[in-house]
Amino acid sequence: MNVFLRADSSLSIGSGHIIRCLNLAKALKKAGAHCIFISKNHHGNILGKITQGNFPLKVIPVLDRTGIYVRDEKSWLDGNQSDDAEQFVSLVSESCLFPDIIIVDHYSLDREWETIVKARFPESYLVVIDDLCNRPHCGDLLIDQTYQRTAKEYLNLNGNDGNILAGTKFALIHPIFAQLRNQSVSRKANITLPKKLMLTMGGVDAQNITGKILDFLEQVDFDNIEKITIILGAACPHSAEISTLGKKSKYCVEVLINISNMAELMLEHDFAIGAMGGTTWERCAMGLPAVNIAIADNQRTIANNLAEAGAIVLNAEKFNASELRCALTHLITHYHEQRLLAMNICDGQGLIRVIQEIILIPAKDGINVTLRKASCNDIDFVYQLQCEPKTRQFARNPEIPEYKNHVKWMQSKLDNGNTFFYIIEHDEECGVIRLDPVENSVAKYEISIFLSSSSHGKGIASAAIKRTLMLHNDIVILATVLPENYASHQLFERLGFLKISPSEYIIERK
């Protein structure tokens, strides 16, 4: 499966489009796809991130490489849509690879570009990523991770509201944020007074909002702040100036440039001042409360929606030292209220949801089968399945568990960071699939699956296991099947598992 991604970065565009496409490409690569980026070499780009991620990169040269910040996103292309589409088509054709999937993430591109590309590659699956909802699209799938966005908002633009993934549940952030979420939430739940402040204004910060905030912080006193950590991207043109300001600050300031451990840093910090954009959803996933700074006109919708929900929002062009002091004071005073608000905005599972909507694995009826991570809210549903006769028939322990024991068991599984616990969905929740680590083994897991009685015989189990193999193709999976469970024996053999004993099957992943 070949995937071509079209996205850009620059002083004006920032780094967010490339970063979220990289997150998506890494997940697709793990699922077996071959991903190729096509980007323009604008001034202030982060194309090095693509090559560092070991992805092939084809560059469209630009006419104007001056380092001027441009506000209007329609001008970010440095050219017209039809020429860009033809250049894209030409580079794809030169690769001699059929584009099974095309992904485009660019505020300067819309239906005009998509129509040209679709006409040239009509069999390709076209995925459009957008946040603005201000122009028409004609892709096969549209992803808009804007907070409180709904598919219906695209009705007047696209002529329909179908096949749209809308809202922060589809935020394309790196899976490490979901992995560290519980640890971060638990740590911050015990904080009485926040002391460690993170300051991050995006990967470029062409307007030097970071410097402005540092100047303002010098004018106010927050005795609780023990340390300020400033995060800058490699493309930030003001890094030297900001480093000098940090050294002169009355606060203990550390400046970090071009980091690769954002999730770990968010785990360690108590609160933040941060730009709107992809890092907003990263902060929320980690339960890191923040003063959110709107740094671009195209962030107004997100800013308004967050403010209406109770989040703290400032406009980069308008706020002063007094307003920053009030915002930080409010955050410190209402710390846990803001912490809970943040963690409820985004759970960090967007990437796994999006991948399953791009790569379809249907049951016999053609309906896509997906997995979502189980939570405490699923305890009763799982118990209902545990009590069904078909579940007990082939379980190691045929006795129905007591409810209190089930709750304790499931909570321990959810708290175990090494266990993968999923709910199977086929239009609605219909089963459970779990991967438990095998003792004294490295990257070896035992699979367990059970469905509701009404879901048997529909190909759902087969699709769910295929989905599990897709999401976890870097581990060894072991299946233990009772001798009399003939259907499961046939299922695992059909899916390519190797029988290693009368009751055990194994599949090794590369």
Give, region by region, the residue ranges found by the protein language model:
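A short, well-ordered alpha-helix in the C-terminal region of glycosyltransferases
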Residues: 336-348
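A short helix-loop-beta-strand connector motif used in the catalytic cores of GNAT acetyltransferases and
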Residues: 410-423
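C-terminal alpha-helical cap of glycosyltransferases
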Residues: 347-367
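Acidic donor-binding loop of glycosyltransferase active sites
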Residues: 267-278
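Acyl-donor (CoA/ACP) binding surface of acyl/acetyltransferases
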Residues: 365-379, 385-388, 421-423, 427-510
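A nucleotide-sugar donor-handling region in carbohydrate enzymes
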Residues: 137-208, 238-240
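Donor-nucleotide binding loops and adjacent catalytic segments primarily
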Residues: 182-269
